Amino acid sequence: MSRQKSQTSKGHGASKGKEREQRTLIRFKTTLMNTLMDVLRHRPGWVEVKDEGEWDFYWCDVSWLRENFDHTYMDEHVRISHFRNHYELTRKNYMVKNLKRFRKQLEREAGKTEAAKCDFFPKTFEMPCEYHLFVEEFRKNPGITWIMKPVARSQGKGIFLFRRLKDIMDWRKGTAGKKVTSVETQATRANVNPSGSHDTRSSDDQKDDIPVENYVAQRYVENPYLIGGRKFDLRVYVLVMSYIPLRAWLYRDGFARFSNTRFTLNSIDDHYVHLTNVAVQKTSPDYHPKKGCKWTLQRFRQYLASKHGPKAVETLFSDMDNIFIKSLQSVQKVIISDKHCFELYGYDILIDQDLKPWLLEVNASPSLTASSQEDYELKTCLLEDTLHVVDMEARLTGKEKRVGGFDLMWNDGPVSREEGPCDLSGMGNFVTNTHLGCINDRKEQLRQLFRSLQVQKKASS
């Protein structure tokens, strides 16, 4: 149950210390009118509460979190869908700042080889505060392409590419609105529900009417891996249940998002070429709503295996595992790890021609609005399995390595794909418990899991 701190105790206040007691009635609340609402309303034993009613589970948006979290009392069993300062990972400038700091820490403590495992994000500068550092770097490498991104906006809004220092000088003076507006206008025409479907509605959103907001200037990956001549990125889902200790799950399914136009560096102003966001692509004249611009990760993995062989694919996906873990570790000491909180992150990964993955950003509010029937089914399963792992019903033992489509990849240390204790001293033959893009037989796994849990419960009673 949740209530404002100023209110008197009532309802399930006596539940303190009994968070593992099984519950048959879960009161939920959410303001997001999309796939999430369908999943919550169809979950057995879950009932919706509105307005100021007391709740056990709240899938909130980050604006509510910012305004109310510090003033809300929560009993032991209550769960909420964001960590208090999630923006340390999900706001672009903070993410880079934390990754840079973590890399330096690794170099001091473990050497350059270990620190090099953090070299998965393009060279990035925060603007305008690192403007002079950026200019110095820009002049060292004339002619390359850079991309400007507002630190706290989504759906391609405010993004533009450039190669001339004059473009950045115009932006710094607050006169680059023409380029920014062209992208914003196209994305706005997508007519997507702003209450629930936008990615990364950050805790520190900037208002659009200020002349120059904080941006990051990032070296543009000029050699992306292309399929059918088109650029794409990957959306991958990571569920964090705790930061101290770090406990993270990786979902087997996700998707590749394609641009609608063949890739070229000759037209850097054409965002249909360079931005893969669905909100941008669906405004393209060539966009087909039924066809969409997505592949499942399983299809993508099979395609790569046929082109490059299983070994190259294993290396690529292992490198992505490294991105997930290192990025979470980079904020482990700064995220407020409240036991009431969990977070479903949407990672955006770009693959280059050398099959090297690059982290573009991490979303605190990945879109849960479906763009097709296939997308609806994926997100429905994702959300159902998220609720299974969050386990409001207190059915799990806490020792599970797989729940539906989620695989436990980190539990205060790496989790092995093999059963039983593992020797981590050399990590030579260690294989992380991840199956991204592999077969997701979640229904059968859940059936067996809950049957086993029922047997264990009967045996112990």
Curated annotation (Swiss-Prot):
Q: Where is this site: Essential for specifying alpha-elongation versus initiation step of the polyglutamylase activity?
A: 155
Q: Name one GO biological process term.
A: flagellated sperm motility
Summarize where L-glutamate binds, as residue positions: 257, 294, 379
One Pfam family of this chain:
TTL
Instruction: List each copy of the TTL domain by range.
Output: 22-402
Which residues of this UniProt protein bind Mg(2+) 2?
Answer: 361, 363
Q: What are the binding positions for a protein in this chain?
A: 155
Question: Which EC number applies?
Answer: 6.3.2.-
Q: Which SUPFAM superfamilies match?
A: Glutathione synthetase ATP-binding domain-like
- Where on this chain does Mg(2+) 1 bind? 348, 361
Taking the first listed entry, what is the main subcellular location of this protein, grouped into a coarse class? cytoplasm
The coenzyme or cofactor needed here is: Mg(2+)
Instruction: Cite the InterPro entries for this sequence.
Output: ATP_grasp_subdomain_1 (IPR013815), TTL/TTLL_fam (IPR004344)
Q: What residues bind ATP, as annotated?
A: 149, 155-156, 218-221, 231-233, 276-277
Which catalysed reactions does the entry list for this protein? (L-glutamyl)(n)-gamma-L-glutamyl-L-glutamyl-[protein] + L-glutamate + ATP = (L-glutamyl)(n+1)-gamma-L-glutamyl-L-glutamyl-[protein] + ADP + phosphate + H(+)
**UniProt free text on domains:** Gln-155 is the main determinant for regioselectivity, which segregates between initiases and elongases in all tubulin--tyrosine ligase family. A glutamine residue at this position is found in elongases TTLL6, TTLL9, TTLL11, TTLL13, TTLL10 and favors glutamate-chain elongation, whereas an arginine residue is found in initiases TTLL2, TTLL4, TTLL5, TTLL3, TTLL8 and favors initiation.
Annotated protein name in UniProt: Probable tubulin polyglutamylase TTLL9
> Species lineage, top-down?
Eukaryota, Metazoa, Chordata, Craniata, Vertebrata
